[in-house]
């Protein structure tokens, strides 16, 4: 056939449809000659149309297939199908330059005008075949992975699994294919949540993971961490999901071991019981094991706890680990015996490692508990029992129907040592007094330090003559002066004695305290029995004390707020929060009455804690109303300062309500400045470090020296109302106030005069440069809800 005839034939039969086809199109006649060769075919083979048309098709067949090709064509012409399978056949096409590319092709047999033609449609499949080869290699690689892997179709059916999956779960691909993992691996009797979470993971459209308890083909239950990774095509259509598995059974056991032990620690069981809990949990993880714990005391191992199993284990292998404190010092020994082959060595080592850390925590917890117990029950300076210990001791005696005699001992004149030599030497003086007490202490007597310079002796000798003899012996303890830094300091004791059959602890301590106060008010250096007159007063206090306890627990106390004004500008300096109590039975009870009572019955710290929290809450509420209060001051008892929880209580309240330290001022009395307790001053310094101001209330009523004022981190001093009342009539008082304001200015302290009621008092105080004024002249103490109205209608005051 000539070239023009071929062109005409192609043009008439195939050209309109195939010339622009993106697939290579090749048409051959009954003589196997190429009649049509479109541009796409030119691109695939690298031949020009003119080179191919009219030539035998063999020139387009790869050399290695040419020998068999004529027979294939002949066979097909004689009875082959009209259409060979679509585009599903791959063939390596050999180009003009000898290079080869992968293609997909379909061959169609066409009969026309009694002649048989063949049309081949071919497209480049290089990328597909490369991907197919990559997939094949990937499948081989995945099959050799140590981690189990399955491949899912978009309907979450398993289409592929590797050998590691088969080894872990027991299912080969023929058994797993077409199954959904939540059906194949779920434990029927396990809570539904397990399967629901597995289903949720399977239907994730992004990477995710979770942990499940799954079932193997053999019925074994194993903890698994499963991860899912969706695979998308270029059009963001989901093609497959790859799911990987990790056996975390041992990891879960170790986490459970750690969690169980930590949970037990939170309940603070006794030390030996905690050890048994650790042993039992180790035993539950390690099959056929025996566990022992030893604590080191002075370097020697002391048995702490053991598991319940007997120590005799067949073919036992032993593991031993040193339990160490945080600083690395040895604190104990952990011993584990397991049956040979019961567990892998690596797993036992992991269990031993985490267990020794848990045991170390338990030992530290016990050490901390003992330390806290020591702090709670004993005075850190003297080593004597403290107030808490005393309360427990007296309660125990009363419960046993024993009537003790209580001697409340106040050491007089310690202040002389402080003023002369300082606090450190005063500590030494008190320790010397304690040592002398101990030398005289009898086996059945109990001695404790309840605060500062006050001690309590409890004796079971209740004969009157014996009581007075003991009191005299106590006084004789300090008959000789205490030698401090080669200087003699004469000290005396004021002793209050209480004894009454069937009375409780509060009664005994209150009455002894009243008796001691009576001695001190009369010059000290003596002892005093509690009198009937005192008894009536105590009864009244006990009734009122019960009411006060109820008021505190029922939140019946209230705070009122008295403004403080700058004397020169009339602007607000701050507000003082004052506690008030109105009892349904006793009516209005003044602070001068219920505050000392709260101190006696041990409720003063609860009041102080409430005052701090309520003041901070109210300050935050005003702030939310855009009411600016520069500072709020609160009064705290000296006893509250003896609590090591005070700084934390203040910090917690400030943090809870978002209060800055400079917005809060804590007031202490001048008499508390004279207290000899270094712990108190440490707590004061902590408060100042938090930014909290420190005000000395009732300044001038005590006997504190300037050295004390300088040594404390004071920011403010308050002139007592008793001086303000007399400043207009007594020149000496006025001179004292002038001196106080001058001292305040020199030390950069704010001086506040409280109790100012008249214009004359105000003018006089402003004249001597008292910076801040507080009192009824400006405002009475107001409920919180009245403060905003007062500020908007009065401030700034016209001075």
Curated annotation (Swiss-Prot):
Give the record's PTM text.
Answer: The heme distal ligand is coordinated by Met-87 in the active Fe(2+) (ferrous) form, by O(2) in the O(2)-bound form and by H(2)O in the inactive Fe(3+) (ferric) form.
Record key words, sorted: c-di-GMP, Heme, Hydrolase, Iron, Magnesium, Metal-binding, Repeat, Sensory transduction, Transcription, Transcription regulation
Q: What's the effect of swapping residue 89 to A/E/I?
A: The Fe(2+)-O(2) form loses c-di-GMP PDE activity, due to reduced O(2) affinity and/or increased auto-oxidation. NO and CO forms are less affected
Altering residue 69 to A/G: what's the impact? Loss of heme binding
Biological process GO terms, please?
Answer: regulation of single-species biofilm formation; response to oxygen levels
PAC domain span: 208-260
EC identifiers of the protein: 3.1.4.52
Where do the GGDEF domain residues begin and end?
402-532
Q: Could you say which enzyme class this protein belongs to? A: hydrolase
Record's SMART domains? EAL, GGDEF, PAC, PAS
| Sequence positions that bind heme | 69, 87
Q: Name the reported effect of residue 87 to H.
A: No change in heme coordination; increases c-di-GMP PDE activity 2-fold in absence of O(2), CO or NO, and 2-fold more upon addition of gases
Q: Which cellular components does GO assign to this protein?
A: plasma membrane
Q: How does it assemble?
A: Homodimer; has been previously suggested to be a homotetramer based on size exclusion chromatography. Forms a complex with DosC.
UniProt function note: Heme-based oxygen sensor protein displaying phosphodiesterase (PDE) activity toward c-di-GMP in response to oxygen availability. Involved in the modulation of intracellular c-di-GMP levels, in association with DosC which catalyzes the biosynthesis of c-di-GMP (diguanylate cyclase activity). Cyclic-di-GMP is a second messenger which controls cell surface-associated traits in bacteria. Has very poor PDE activity on cAMP but is not active with cGMP, bis(p-nitrophenyl) phosphate or p-nitrophenyl phosphate.
Q: What is this protein called?
A: Oxygen sensor protein DosP
What organism is recorded for this protein?
Escherichia coli (strain K12)
């Amino acid at each position: 056939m000539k070239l023009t005839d071929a062109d005409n034939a192609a043009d008439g039969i195939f050209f309109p449809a195939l010339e622009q086809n993106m697939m290579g199109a090749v048409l051959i006649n009954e003589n196997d000659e190429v009649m049509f060769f479109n541009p796409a075919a030119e691109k695939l083979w690298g031949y020009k149309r003119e080179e191919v048309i009219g030539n035998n098709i063999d020139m387009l067949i790869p050399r290695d297939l040419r020998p068999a090709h004529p027979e294939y064509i002949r066979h097909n012409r004689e009875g082959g199908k009209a259409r060979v399978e679509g585009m599903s056949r791959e063939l390596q096409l050999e180009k003009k330059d000898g290079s080869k590319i992968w293609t997909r092709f379909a061959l169609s047999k066409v009969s026309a005008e009694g002649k048989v033609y063949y049309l081949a449609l071919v497209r480049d499949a290089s990328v597909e075949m490369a991907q197919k080869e990559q997939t094949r290699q990937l499948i081989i690689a995945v099959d050799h992975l140590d981690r189990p892997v399955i491949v899912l179709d978009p309907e979450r059916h398993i289409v592929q699994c590797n050998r590691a999956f088969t080894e872990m779960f027991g299912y080969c691909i023929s058994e797993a294919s077409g199954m959904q993992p939540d059906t194949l691996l779920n434990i029927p009797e396990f809570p539904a949540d397990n399967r629901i979470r597995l289903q949720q993971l399977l239907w994730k459209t992004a990477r995710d993971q979770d942990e499940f308890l799954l079932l193997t083909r053999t019925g074994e239950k194993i903890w698994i961490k499963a991860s899912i990774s969706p695979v998308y095509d270029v059009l963001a259509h989901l093609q497959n999901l790859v799911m990987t598995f990790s056996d975390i059974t041992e990891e879960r056991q170790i986490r459970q071991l750690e969690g169980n032990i930590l949970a037990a620690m939170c309940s603070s069981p006794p030390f030996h019981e905690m050890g048994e809990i650790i042993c039992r949990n180790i035993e539950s993880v390690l099959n056929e094991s025996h566990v022992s714990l030893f604590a080191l005391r002075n370097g020697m191992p002391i048995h702490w706890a053991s598991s319940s199993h007997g120590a005799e284990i067949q073919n036992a292998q032993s593991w031993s680990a040193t339990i160490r404190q945080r600083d690395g010092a040895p604190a104990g020994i952990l011993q584990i015996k397991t049956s040979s082959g019961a567990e892998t060595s690596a797993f036992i080592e992991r269990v031993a490692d985490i267990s020794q850390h848990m045991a170390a925590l338990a030992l530290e917890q016990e050490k901390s508990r003992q330390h806290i117990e020591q702090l709670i029950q004993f005075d850190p300076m003297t080593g004597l029992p403290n107030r808490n210990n005393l309360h427990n001791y007296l309660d125990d005696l009363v419960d046993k129907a024993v009537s003790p005699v209580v001697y409340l001992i106040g050491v007089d004149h310690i202040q002389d040592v402080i003023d002369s030599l300082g606090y450190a030497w005063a500590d030494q003086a008190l320790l010397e007094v304690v040592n002398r007490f101990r030398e005289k202490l009898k086996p059945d007597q109990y001695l404790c330090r309840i605060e500062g310079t006050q001690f309590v002796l409890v004796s079971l000798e209740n004969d009157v003559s014996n009581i007075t003899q003991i009191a005299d012996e106590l006084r004789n303890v300090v008959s000789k002066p205490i030698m401090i830094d080669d200087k003699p300091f004469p000290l005396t004791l004021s002793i209050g004695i209480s004894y009454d059959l069937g009375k409780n602890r509060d009664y005994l301590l209150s009455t002894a305290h009243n008796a001691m106060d009576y001695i001190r008010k009369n010059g000290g250096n003596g002892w005093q029995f509690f009198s009937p007159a005192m008894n009536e007063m105590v009864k009244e206090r006990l009734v009122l004390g019960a009411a006060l306890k109820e008021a505190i627990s029922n939140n019946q106390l209230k705070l009122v707020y008295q403004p403080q004004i700058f004397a020169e500008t009339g602007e607000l300096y701050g507000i003082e929060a004052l506690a008030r109590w109105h009892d349904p039975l006793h009516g209005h009870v003044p602070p001068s009455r219920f505050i000392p009572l709260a101190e006696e019955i041990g409720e003063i710290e609860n009041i102080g804690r409430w005052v701090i929290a309520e003041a901070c809450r109210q300050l935050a509420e005003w702030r939310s109303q855009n009411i600016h209060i520069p500072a709020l001051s609160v009064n705290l008892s000296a006893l509250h300062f003896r609590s090591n929880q005070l700084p934390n209580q203040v910090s917690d309240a400030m943090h809870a309500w978002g209060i800055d330290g400079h917005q809060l001022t804590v007031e202490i009395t001048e008499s508390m400045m004279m207290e000899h307790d270094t712990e108190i001053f440490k707590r004061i310094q902590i408060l100042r470090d938090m930014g909290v101001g420190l005000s000395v209330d009732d300044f001038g009523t005590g006997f504190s020296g300037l050295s004390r004022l300088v040594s404390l981190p004071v920011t403010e001093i308050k002139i007592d109302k008793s001086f303000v009342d007399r400043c207009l009539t007594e020149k000496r008082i006025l001179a004292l106030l002038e001196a106080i304001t001058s001292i305040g200015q020199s030390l950069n302290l704010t001086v506040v005069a409280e109790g100012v009621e008249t214009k004359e008092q105000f003018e006089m105080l402003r004249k001597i440069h008292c910076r801040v004024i507080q009192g009824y002249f400006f405002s009475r103490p107001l409920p919180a809800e009245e403060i905003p109205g007062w500020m908007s209608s009065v401030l700034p005051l016209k001075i």
